[in-house]
Swiss-Prot record:
Protein name in UniProt: Transcriptional repressor NrdR
Gene from which this protein is expressed: nrdR
Zinc finger (unnamed): 3-34
Family annotation (PANTHER family): TRANSCRIPTIONAL REPRESSOR NRDR
GO MF, one annotated term: ATP binding
Lineage: Bacteria, Pseudomonadati, Pseudomonadota, Gammaproteobacteria, Enterobacterales
HAMAP family (alphabetical): NrdR
The keyword Nucleotide-binding is assigned to this record: yes
Keyword Repressor: yes
Species name: Sodalis glossinidius (strain morsitans)
Function noted in UniProt: Negatively regulates transcription of bacterial ribonucleotide reductase nrd genes and operons by binding to NrdR-boxes.
Free-text remark on how the cofactor is bound: Binds 1 zinc ion.
Cofactor requirement: Zn(2+)
Keywords carried by this UniProt record: ATP-binding, DNA-binding, Metal-binding, Nucleotide-binding, Repressor, Transcription, Transcription regulation, Zinc, Zinc-finger
Family stated for the protein in its record: Belongs to the NrdR family.
Length: 149
Protein backbone atom coordinates (compact mmCIF):
# COMPACT_ATOMS: atom_id res chain seq x y z
CA UNK A 1 0.00 0.00 0.00
CA UNK A 2 1.26 3.49 -0.86
CA UNK A 3 2.12 5.81 2.01
CA UNK A 4 -0.35 8.74 2.06
CA UNK A 5 2.43 11.04 3.33
CA UNK A 6 5.41 10.40 1.04
CA UNK A 7 3.84 8.08 -1.60
CA UNK A 8 6.41 5.36 -0.93
CA UNK A 9 5.32 1.92 -2.09
CA UNK A 10 6.64 0.04 0.95
CA UNK A 11 4.66 0.00 4.19
CA UNK A 12 4.47 -2.58 6.93
CA UNK A 13 1.51 -3.68 9.01
CA UNK A 14 2.05 -3.02 12.73
CA UNK A 15 -1.34 -4.19 14.02
CA UNK A 16 -4.47 -5.89 12.61
CA UNK A 17 -7.80 -6.43 14.29
CA UNK A 18 -11.41 -7.14 13.40
CA UNK A 19 -13.90 -4.30 13.79
CA UNK A 20 -17.51 -3.65 12.79
CA UNK A 21 -18.89 -6.96 14.07
CA UNK A 22 -16.16 -8.82 12.24
CA UNK A 23 -17.01 -7.34 8.84
CA UNK A 24 -13.92 -5.11 8.63
CA UNK A 25 -10.21 -5.45 9.29
CA UNK A 26 -8.50 -2.41 10.79
CA UNK A 27 -4.79 -2.27 10.03
CA UNK A 28 -2.26 0.08 11.57
CA UNK A 29 0.54 0.62 9.08
CA UNK A 30 3.93 2.34 9.11
CA UNK A 31 5.86 3.65 6.12
CA UNK A 32 9.36 2.17 5.91
CA UNK A 33 10.68 5.38 4.29
CA UNK A 34 9.24 8.27 6.34
CA UNK A 35 8.12 6.21 9.39
CA UNK A 36 4.69 7.91 9.46
CA UNK A 37 1.83 5.75 10.74
CA UNK A 38 -1.66 5.52 9.32
CA UNK A 39 -4.76 3.35 9.58
CA UNK A 40 -6.53 1.45 6.82
CA UNK A 41 -9.80 -0.48 6.82
CA UNK A 42 -10.50 -3.52 4.66
CA UNK A 43 -14.01 -4.59 3.76
CA UNK A 44 -15.00 -7.47 1.51
CA UNK A 45 -16.67 -6.27 -1.65
CA UNK A 46 -19.91 -8.19 -1.67
CA UNK A 47 -22.22 -8.08 -4.65
CA UNK A 48 -25.95 -8.31 -4.12
CA UNK A 49 -28.05 -10.36 -6.54
CA UNK A 50 -30.05 -8.71 -9.31
CA UNK A 51 -33.80 -8.42 -8.79
CA UNK A 52 -36.30 -10.15 -11.08
CA UNK A 53 -39.45 -8.05 -11.05
CA UNK A 54 -42.94 -9.52 -11.52
CA UNK A 55 -42.91 -8.49 -15.22
CA UNK A 56 -39.60 -10.41 -15.68
CA UNK A 57 -37.56 -7.21 -15.99
CA UNK A 58 -34.20 -7.55 -14.25
CA UNK A 59 -32.59 -4.66 -12.42
CA UNK A 60 -29.77 -4.15 -9.93
CA UNK A 61 -30.64 -4.36 -6.24
CA UNK A 62 -31.48 -0.85 -5.03
CA UNK A 63 -30.88 -0.31 -1.32
CA UNK A 64 -32.53 3.12 -1.43
CA UNK A 65 -35.71 1.58 -2.79
CA UNK A 66 -35.67 -0.93 0.07
CA UNK A 67 -35.08 1.84 2.62
CA UNK A 68 -37.85 3.95 1.09
CA UNK A 69 -40.33 1.08 1.45
CA UNK A 70 -39.41 0.66 5.10
CA UNK A 71 -39.65 4.39 5.80
CA UNK A 72 -43.06 4.74 4.12
CA UNK A 73 -44.46 1.86 6.17
CA UNK A 74 -42.85 3.17 9.37
CA UNK A 75 -43.82 6.82 8.89
CA UNK A 76 -44.78 8.39 12.25
CA UNK A 77 -44.17 5.09 14.06
CA UNK A 78 -41.90 4.80 17.14
CA UNK A 79 -39.10 2.80 15.50
CA UNK A 80 -35.45 3.84 15.77
CA UNK A 81 -33.56 4.49 12.55
CA UNK A 82 -30.81 2.16 13.84
CA UNK A 83 -33.38 -0.65 13.97
CA UNK A 84 -34.39 0.09 10.36
CA UNK A 85 -30.74 0.03 9.25
CA UNK A 86 -30.18 -3.27 11.08
CA UNK A 87 -33.23 -4.75 9.32
CA UNK A 88 -31.96 -3.54 5.94
CA UNK A 89 -28.51 -5.00 6.59
CA UNK A 90 -30.08 -8.27 7.70
CA UNK A 91 -32.10 -8.47 4.47
CA UNK A 92 -28.98 -7.75 2.42
CA UNK A 93 -27.14 -10.53 4.29
CA UNK A 94 -30.00 -12.93 3.62
CA UNK A 95 -29.94 -12.06 -0.08
CA UNK A 96 -26.18 -12.63 -0.28
CA UNK A 97 -26.55 -15.91 1.61
CA UNK A 98 -28.80 -17.29 -1.13
CA UNK A 99 -25.74 -17.53 -3.36
CA UNK A 100 -27.99 -16.68 -6.31
CA UNK A 101 -27.12 -14.14 -8.98
CA UNK A 102 -30.79 -13.16 -9.29
CA UNK A 103 -33.69 -13.24 -6.83
CA UNK A 104 -37.39 -12.55 -7.39
CA UNK A 105 -38.74 -9.25 -6.04
CA UNK A 106 -41.38 -11.30 -4.23
CA UNK A 107 -38.63 -12.79 -2.05
CA UNK A 108 -37.46 -9.31 -1.05
CA UNK A 109 -41.04 -8.26 -0.31
CA UNK A 110 -41.49 -11.27 1.96
CA UNK A 111 -38.22 -10.49 3.77
CA UNK A 112 -39.42 -6.91 4.31
CA UNK A 113 -42.74 -8.17 5.67
CA UNK A 114 -40.96 -10.52 8.08
CA UNK A 115 -38.76 -7.66 9.30
CA UNK A 116 -41.69 -5.25 9.69
CA UNK A 117 -43.67 -7.85 11.60
CA UNK A 118 -40.88 -7.86 14.20
CA UNK A 119 -40.34 -4.09 14.19
CA UNK A 120 -43.88 -2.71 14.23
CA UNK A 121 -47.22 -4.45 13.62
CA UNK A 122 -48.94 -1.29 12.33
CA UNK A 123 -46.16 -0.73 9.78
CA UNK A 124 -46.46 -4.40 8.81
CA UNK A 125 -50.19 -3.96 8.07
CA UNK A 126 -49.50 -0.78 6.09
CA UNK A 127 -46.87 -2.52 3.97
CA UNK A 128 -48.95 -5.69 3.57
CA UNK A 129 -51.97 -3.71 2.39
CA UNK A 130 -49.99 -2.26 -0.50
CA UNK A 131 -47.75 -5.27 -1.17
CA UNK A 132 -50.67 -7.72 -1.26
CA UNK A 133 -53.06 -5.21 -2.86
CA UNK A 134 -55.82 -5.39 -0.24
CA UNK A 135 -59.17 -4.69 -1.91
CA UNK A 136 -61.43 -4.20 1.11
CA UNK A 137 -61.59 -3.96 4.88
CA UNK A 138 -62.15 -7.72 5.22
CA UNK A 139 -58.60 -8.38 3.99
CA UNK A 140 -57.24 -5.97 6.60
CA UNK A 141 -59.21 -7.83 9.28
CA UNK A 142 -57.93 -11.22 8.13
CA UNK A 143 -54.33 -10.02 8.21
CA UNK A 144 -54.78 -8.47 11.66
CA UNK A 145 -56.32 -11.73 12.89
CA UNK A 146 -53.29 -13.66 11.58
CA UNK A 147 -51.02 -11.27 13.48
CA UNK A 148 -52.89 -11.94 16.72
CA UNK A 149 -52.43 -15.72 16.45
Amino acid sequence: MHCPFCSAVDTKVIDSRLVGEGTQVRRRRQCVICNERFTTFEVAELVLPRVIKSNDVREPFNEEKLRSGFLKALEKRPVKSDDVEMAINHIKSQLRATGEREVPSKMIGNLVMDALKKLDKVAYIRFASVYRSFEDIREFGEEIARLQD
